[in-house]
Amino acid sequence: MSPAAQASGVMLSVRDAHVAYGTGVVALQGVSLEVRVGEAVALVGANGAGKTTLLKTIAGLLSPRSGEIWFDGHRIDGVEAPDRVDLGIALVPEGRRLFSRLSVAENLRLGTFRDRDPKRRQEMLERVFGLFPVLRQRVDQRAGTLSGGEGQMLSIARALMSRPRFLMLDEPSLGIMPRIVDSILDVLQMLHRQEGLTVLLVEQNVPAALAAAERGYVLQTGRIVAEGTSQSLLDSDLVRRAYLGM
């Protein structure tokens, strides 16, 4: 960690980010948020609010028209996506984005494609098999034949293969049985609480997302409209009316 980040305790800082797609559709309008070192933060909002756009912008897959992104005390909005992975940023994308014709093992090795140390790559492979034992059982199976829950485990495990310090997850519960979701969230909470992994979690399941995080932000039509501790957001009239049906 850089001295600046260590002094402030902030790992990620998004400052007044504006993002628009080529059609001119504005997706983010002056978004600012912070994630502190070792913190788990939830980003919630309805479909089309801009949650996925924000994660892609942080990961370097989209470029902001204006605003700044800082990571570990350094400005990174001009840094290419693969180089952001080297900095310790990993994204588990919505819909998993697996290579369906490749095996589980081959998908996992793609998570370490920039690591030339075979011993370290094997260590990480054993580590993710320990977190998700079913993947060891399916190691030679094509990713396209996995169940939804197994596919999500593989997507998360692939991201963990890069040894991230900052992990972003986009709708990890989408299309998965509740008991599998609980199992996946348990693993993420263990990594966060026991190993200090910093997490930014995007979820439409607002209670589950806020239960897994210390703080949260509410994104609405490209703008942050609320932020606070998880409990304060659960208690807020805005969240209760818009997302909890109360």
Q: Where are each of the predicted segments found?
A:
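The feature captures the beta-strand-to-loop junction immediately N-terminal to the Walker
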Residues: 44-46
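Helix-to-loop junction immediately C-terminal to a conserved catalytic motif
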Residues: 59
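Conserved ABC transporter NBD signature motif
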Residues: 67-76, 87, 120-125
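Conserved ABC ATPase signature
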Residues: 142-146, 150
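ABC ATPase C-loop
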Residues: 159-160
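Conserved catalytic motifs of ABC-family nucleotide-binding domains
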Residues: 163
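Helical segment within the ABC ATPase nucleotide-binding domain
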Residues: 182-196
